[in-house]
């Protein structure tokens, strides 16, 4: 699997189409940035800088990215959840909530840089909207999934992989604004998850869409997910316009 570097594409999502074809004006416009394959530290530093320097007039943004292999450990995370210290995958300590997780090729990572006060959103409501967007995205591929109380993320609803985690979520709120976000596993090498207790849960199975016999294209899933996120954030049923696709292969 590979991702060719592409320029950052900024797509203001100001007007979308309703199911009936009539224009719908979202409550708060959002800019979608498709950042391609990018080192985790680059994204981390950029989202912190964006949040630290934003003002009341700064627009909200959603960043879509794919990272090279990396473990990230939340600010209250226990390093003991990294079970194999010499795996060859770097570990980065970060300031989001949650424990340890893995990012790698074939996984969609979405960062939500939102002014919650302007959107009149409580953190719990934001988490629910994000989880709903993931559930709706998976449903578009005939995959049933659920949330679990007290365990942010999305889990397989039934079948041989019932209870397995397919999407992770972790946020940081600073001065009323969010950053970090979510990851959704499409088609990836899942072996690095065996070297950790995913999100701090020993023995938690982690799967991707391919494990569930869905041969989904990374770009298509990413576009669906971004559309559902924007629709849920703005309380509309309309899907967002599709930004330019990343040069991406699921091979």
From Swiss-Prot:
Residues 56-237 form the BPL/LPL catalytic domain. In the reaction, the free carboxyl group of octanoic acid is attached via an amide linkage to the epsilon-amino group of a specific lysine residue of lipoyl domains of lipoate-dependent enzymes. It is an enzyme of class 2 (transferase). Its EC number is 2.3.1.181. The active site is at 199 (acyl-thioester intermediate). PROSITE patterns: BPL_LPL_CATALYTIC, LIPB. The gene is lipB. One of its GO terms (cellular component) is cytoplasm. This is Octanoyltransferase.
């Amino acid at each position: 699997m590979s991702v060719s570097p592409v320029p950052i594409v900024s797509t203001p999502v100001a007007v979308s189409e309703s199911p009936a074809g009539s224009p719908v004006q979202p409550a708060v416009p959002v800019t979608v940035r498709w950042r391609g394959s990018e080192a985790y530290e680059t994204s981390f530093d950029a989202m912190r800088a964006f949040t630290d320097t934003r003002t009341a007039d700064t627009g909200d943004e959603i960043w879509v990215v794919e990272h090279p292999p990396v473990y990230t450990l939340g600010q209250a995370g226990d390093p003991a959840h990294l079970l194999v210290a010499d795996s060859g995958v770097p570990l980065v300590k970060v300031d989001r909530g949650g424990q340890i997780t893995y990012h790698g090729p074939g996984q969609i990572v979405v960062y939500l840089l939102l002014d919650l006060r302007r959107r009149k959103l409580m953190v719990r409501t934001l988490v629910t909207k994000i989880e709903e967007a993931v559930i709706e995205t998976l449903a578009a591929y005939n995959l049933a999934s659920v949330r679990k109380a007290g365990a942010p993320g999305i889990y397989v609803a039934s079948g041989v992989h019932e209870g397995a985690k397919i999407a992770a979520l972790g946020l940081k709120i600073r001065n009323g604004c969010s950053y970090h976000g979510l990851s959704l596993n499409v088609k990836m090498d899942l072996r690095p998850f065996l070297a950790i207790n995913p999100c701090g849960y020993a023995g938690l199975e982690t799967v991707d869409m391919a494990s569930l016999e869905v041969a989904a294209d990374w770009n298509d899933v990413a576009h669906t997910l971004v559309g559902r996120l924007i629709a849920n954030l703005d309380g509309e049923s309309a899907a967002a316009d599709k930004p330019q696709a990343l040069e991406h292969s699921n091979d």
